[in-house]
Amino acid sequence: AEAGELIAVIGPSGSGKSTFLTIAGGLQSPSSGDVIINGNHLSALKEKKRASLRLKEIGFVLQSSNLIPFLSVKQQMRLLDKVKKDNLKKDQLKDMYESLGIGDLLNSFPSDLSGGQRQRVAIAKALYTDPSIILADEPTASLDSDRAFEVMDLLKSATKKNRKTTIVVTHDTRLIDYCD
């Protein structure tokens, strides 16, 4: 996949889609073959280097939005600043909040948000660290059709606008139209 492309891996439950993502994201090693991210062969890297590459180059969007329940949206982002430096600048962050439609939710906690809002915050978290790759594991699974399409519109828009490579794994064939 190239920068600015959104691609999907589609298959039935149990077909290995999530396993593929954990391997592509450097969380698991392949039994054969290799994953190369920006010239780095993941299987050749020691765990510490692989973790560093993962933090710098990969943003994850999970099926369950994976937000910390006791932190507001704004605090979720600040926590990322403690783990990784050189995240989006304030003006870029403000633009991202607006483009994802979460600018007015910054002081809200996950329990105050709808499923679609939580997924938009999860996308914001994945984009905030400015990775080159977004890996999304069934990002629309818990959403109704309208919200699922909204999330895919946002992922596609963010992919194009920010020149990211986005890989979505899903069993939902309705999402094919969003892919390159």
Model-found features: residue ranges?
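Helix N-cap at the start of a conserved alpha-helix in ABC-type nucleotide-binding domains
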Residues: 145-147
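Short coil-to-helix segment of the ABC ATPase nucleotide-binding domain corresponding to the Q-loop/switch region
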Residues: 71-78
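Conserved signature/switch motifs of ABC ATPase nucleotide-binding domains
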Residues: 55, 108-111, 129
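Catalytic Walker B motif of ABC-type/P-loop ATPase nucleotide-binding domains
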Residues: 134-137
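Helix-to-loop junction immediately C-terminal to a conserved catalytic motif
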Residues: 25
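Conserved ABC ATPase signature
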Residues: 109-119
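Conserved ABC transporter NBD signature motif
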Residues: 33-41
